[in-house]
Amino acid sequence: RATVAQPR
């Protein structure tokens, strides 16, 4: 599921 850009 593509959500908001996560810094990981």
Swiss-Prot record:
Name of the featured protein: Unknown protein 11
Domain of life: Eukaryota
UniProt organism field: Pseudotsuga menziesii (Douglas-fir)
